[in-house]
Amino acid sequence: MSYESDTREAYRNKTKASAYKNQYITGFKWARFTMWKQKIIINNYLNSCQFDSDDSLLDIPCGAGYIGEILAKYSCSIVASDISIEMMDLAANEYPNKNFNGFLQSDITNTPFQANEFKCVVVLALMHRLPIDIRAQVLSEVFRVTNKYVIISYSIESLLQKVKWKILSVISKKHIPAPASIPLKVIIDELNSCGLTILKKKRIINFLSAKVVFLVEK
């Protein structure tokens, strides 16, 4: 998998951006179900952050506004950012919060934000698409701009997941596993090495999903 073509530039395309959003808003799809489950976990983590009106949160990459409705419940100011203008166009109506401060196009490895600007940075559906060097750049930048919390998702590589992927590849030739699933120990080591402490971790669905969401603290 090429990081540049399959991730960084992939969703700067209206057709692909729309297809991404449709997977969790239309029909009964496994992706839609797991993303719904993920929202429950994210909501619980956000509650733990105890925001007030002086706080701010960064949703990056915001994609098509997947968690915009959840964020609307909180009194903190919200900023959404993505490298894809096409994705942000689709997210235009997904952040109803009166404290929404708008969209800003940026690369998550090199954002224009101030150090310690946000009480929480949310990074979803990204890390499993990145090679190790880019993951390190992302974590370094996220550490720089948060002053307290990070909510971040990964896809975990494990023996059980390998068995599941093998079964699904037989059942459905169209099944494509996460392009860069990572062993749990590697994830923990990467988070700790950049100064982030894991407070909570939760699998979306045990065995059936490789996705795990972490709440970490600076």
Enumerate the language-model features and the residues they cover:
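A conserved beta-strand element that flanks and buttresses the S-adenosyl-L-methionine
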Residues: 122
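Short, well-ordered alpha-helix to beta-strand connector turns
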Residues: 75, 118, 146-147
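Short catalytic micro-motifs in class I SAM-dependent methyltransferases
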Residues: 125-129
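A short glycine-rich, Lys/Arg-flanked "PGG" loop and its adjoining helix->strand segment in the class I
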Residues: 136-148
